[in-house]
Amino acid sequence: MFWINMALGLVVMYVVMFSMIDGLVDFKNNLNMFYMAVTMWAPMGIFMLATMPGMYPNRRLNLALYALFVLLTAGSFWATRAQALIDDRQFVESMIPHHSGAILMCREADLSDPELVALCGEIVEAQRREIDQMNRIAERLR
């Protein structure tokens, strides 16, 4: 049951990473979102083992799992920061949802400061233009 919980948790965390995109058209599977999901997921394994010891009585296995989850947390954090395995294609697949998030925030935020409202207008225009450009690049890279 532990691994079913963990597998479902990883899937949910990966999908939730995309809750900030402006629309489904900007959904792009990418390694950066996976790295971030693992960075959130692996500590959950530690918390589950630590807070429910009665459910996981095998001490030796638990110690091995603690070590695994610590390594996965550190490794995924490093992979995100180092942009490990992020090539041209992965770069645009990562940046499109990122830019889309800026559009969503500008559109949905309850802004009243005139300078911020104007800035958001510029952000939306620039980010959409850059998303279009990255989509063209992604097509070329396929």
Where are these regions (language model features)?
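Alpha-helical membrane segments of multi-pass proteins
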Residues: 1-142
